[in-house]
């Protein structure tokens, strides 16, 4: 027997994602890459660290954006500074340790500005820090990365925590 009645479905409503939502989307989408790259043998650890640092930046900015820090996260001294973003998130009551863990500090050292003399972004570019005119010293990042598997686990936990926090 066939029912020929018409069903009335509610209208589908979609909203434009906010910038904060965008940060969360990127963090979530980078996470599988971090997890896979952290366990593959014979792969340079820089690949996992670079993507992990970007995922960490995005998840912290998602939390801060949703907590009204839209302008603060763009300040030059904070923008790519994972330690500063971590501390801001702690100050906004994200349930994380007050002091960033070593893996965060190490990621921060390769991810953003590490010198008053310029933007270094060591994970992205293998360039040295050029000191002020007349000083020919060139400092190159040593390539340190965190222990990858524990880092990936902690980033997953943080993403899950922030997802719950921004839904409140």
Give the location of each predicted region.
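Amphipathic alpha-helix face/heptad-repeat signature
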Residues: 23-26, 51-52
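A long, hydrophobic alpha-helical segment
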Residues: 27-46
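Short, charged/polar micro-motifs that form catalytic or ligand-binding hotspots
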Residues: 13, 17, 41-50
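Short, hydrophobic, well-ordered secondary-structure elements
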Residues: 35, 45-67
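Residue-level marker of positions within ordered structural domains that often coincide
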Residues: 1, 39, 60, 128
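Long, charged low-complexity segments
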Residues: 2-20, 24, 68-168
């Amino acid at each position: 027997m066939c029912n020929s009645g018409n069903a009335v479905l509610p209208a589908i409503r979609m909203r434009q994602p906010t910038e904060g939502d965008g940060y969360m989307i990127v963090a979530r989408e980078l996470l599988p890459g971090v997890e896979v790259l952290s366990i593959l043998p014979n792969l340079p650890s820089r690949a996992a660290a670079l993507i992990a640092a970007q995922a960490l930046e995005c998840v912290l900015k998602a939390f801060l954006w949703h907590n009204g820090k839209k302008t603060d996260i763009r300040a030059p001294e904070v923008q790519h500074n994972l330690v500063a973003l971590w501390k801001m998130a702690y100050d906004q009551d994200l349930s994380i340790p007050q002091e960033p863990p070593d893996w965060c500090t190490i990621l921060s050292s390769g991810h953003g500005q590490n010198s008053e003399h310029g933007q270094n972004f060591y994970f992205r570019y293998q360039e040295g820090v050029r000191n002020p005119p007349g000083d020919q010293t060139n400092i190159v990042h040593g390539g340190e990365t965190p222990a990858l598997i524990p880092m990936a686990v902690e980033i997953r936990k943080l993403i899950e925590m922030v997802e719950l926090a921004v839904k409140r």
